[in-house]
């Protein structure tokens, strides 16, 4: 990742959308629309949103057999699938604030972690200004 990459991305048109709480499928559909818009030359997008009801979002390739469907039904937890990879993420109605950052792939570093760090740096800076000690996890996952 270079400073040129960060500078070029900062000079592009961006929009910030603060969404209301919505159900999981709608939040994922809005992320997909934002991605398609950026890919078609539209603005890059930062969305901040909440989930209603509480939702378990599955990674794109995650096996649905890993879900405790009975528990989700008993607790009123919706289940949806993200367009991105990784494992399941629980989004609580009362305690979860989510965000998505969308920009064309060609404008980002080729390495996934470099892109992640580039896009997350402003978030860490904002937490720092709020007095919150936030950083990347340095220990490998079990």
Provide a role label for each language-model segment.
Residues 16, 79, 134-136:
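Short secondary-structure junctions
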Residues 2-74, 81-82, 106:
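Active-site loop/lid in soluble adenylation, ligation, and acyl-transfer enzymes
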Residues 83-106:
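Residues forming anionic-ligand binding surfaces in small-molecule and nucleic-acid pockets
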Residues 51-53, 94, 137-140:
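Short Gly/Ser/Thr- and Asp/Glu-enriched loop/turn motifs at secondary-structure junctions
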Residues 105-142:
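Catalytic beta-strand/loop module used to bind and position nucleotide/cofactor moieties
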Residues 68-71, 90-95, 110-111:
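Short, conserved acidic/polar surface loops in the N-terminal third of protein domains
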């Amino acid at each position: 990742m270079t400073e040129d990459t960060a500078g070029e991305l900062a000079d592009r048109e961006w929009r910030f959308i603060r969404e209301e709480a919505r159900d999981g499928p709608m939040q994922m559909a809005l992320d997909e629309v934002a991605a398609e818009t950026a890919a078609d030359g539209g603005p890059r997008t930062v969305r901040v949103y909440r989930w209603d009801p509480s939702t378990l979002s599955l990674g794109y390739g995650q096996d649905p057999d890993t879900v405790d469907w009975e528990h989700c039904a008993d607790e009123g937890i919706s289940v949806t699938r993200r367009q991105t990879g990784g494992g399941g993420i629980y989004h609580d109605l009362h305690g979860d604030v989510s965000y998505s950052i969308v920009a064309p792939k060609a404008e980002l570093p080729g390495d996934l972690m470099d892109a992640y760090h580039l896009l997350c740096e402003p978030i860490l800076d904002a937490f720092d200004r709020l007095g919150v000690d936030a950083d990347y996890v340095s220990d490998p996952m079990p």
